[in-house]
Amino acid sequence: MSQKDYAHPEALVSTEWVAAHLDDPSVRIVESNEDVLLYDTGHLPGAVHIDWRADLQDQTVRDYIDPAEFAAVCSKNGIGPDTTCVFYGDKSNWWACYALWVFRLFGHNNVKIMNGGRDKWVAEGRPLTREKPRYAPVEYPVLSVRRDAEIRAFFEDADQHSKSGLPLIDVRSPGEFRGEITHMPEYPQEGVLRGGHVPGAKSVPWKTAVNDDGTFKSREELEKIYTQGCALSPDKDIVAYCRIGERSSHTWFVLTYLLGYKNVRNYDGSWTEWGNRVRAPIARGE
C-alpha cells in the first residue's frame, strides 16, 4: 500500500513536498517541539515556531487559549483562515500532531503533517536556518466559541467510556499503563500522585503506529493494530489518552486522518488529571 491508501492522504505530506512548497505563500510551515529551544538551533527555511505551552495553553487555567488569543497567534505568524498549515517537530511529531489538533479546536481544518518530522528532514541533509521569518500580520476571524465537543474529551467523557465499556485507549508506554511508573522511563517520575490506567482502557502505545524513522506505518499495518488488534471501527465513539494529551493527539491523528475514523476524541487532561483526582478509579497491571 502507498500513502494514497490512507483515508485522508492529503493530510500527510512528504519532506519532498514540503521542500517544493517552502516559498508557497498559501502554505505556512509550523514547527512545534517538546524541546521549545530546538527551533532556535535551526529550522526549516520560512518555518514559524509555535510553542505548545506558551502559545497554545492558557497561562492561568489548565485549558487552551481563547478564540481571540488564537486569532492573534495566527495573525502574528502570517496565518490566515485559508492558509495551509504544515506541522512538523521532534519526537516523531508528537507536538506537531498536538498543535494540529489544537488548530482543529478552532476550526482551522486546512492542516497537514510532514511525515517523519524534523528528524527525517535532518537525516536527509535538507537545509536548516537560524533566520527567523517575518510575516506581515493578517486578519484572522475570531470564533464565538472554541469547538471542543467534536474532537476533545473531558474527565466525564472518559469516565463514561470506562463505566459503559465504550472504546478507551491508553497510548502511553506499557510500564505507565501497568502503574509501574508515572511517566516515560527516561523522564522524571513526577506530576501525578498515582500510577495505573483508567479501568477498561486498552493499552495501545502510540509508538506502534510509526516506523523506526518516525514515519507512519502503512494503512494495512495500522488496520492490523487498531481495527483487528483492538476491535475498533470507524463508526465507534473512541477516546484516547496519555499523560498530558500530546501522545494521544498523535494517535488521534492516525485514527482520524490515516484510518478515517469519524468519532475520535483526545482526552487532553489524560493521566495527570485522572491520576491526581480524588477517588478516581484506577486499575493496575495488564
Where are these regions (language model features)?
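Thiolate-centered catalytic microenvironments shared by cysteine-dependent enzyme domains
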Residues: 2-7, 64-164, 180-181, 196, ...
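Positively charged, proline/Ser/Thr-rich regional signature most characteristic
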Residues: 3-82, 157-230, 234-235
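Terminal peptide-recognition signature
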Residues: 18, 47, 103, 121, ...
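Short, charged, surface-exposed secondary-structure boundary motifs
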Residues: 56-62, 121-124, 140, 213-214, ...
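Short low-complexity, flexible loop/linker segments enriched in glycine and/or proline
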Residues: 126-129, 184-185, 279-281
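Extended hydrophobic/aromatic segments used for targeting, binding, or gating
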Residues: 262-286
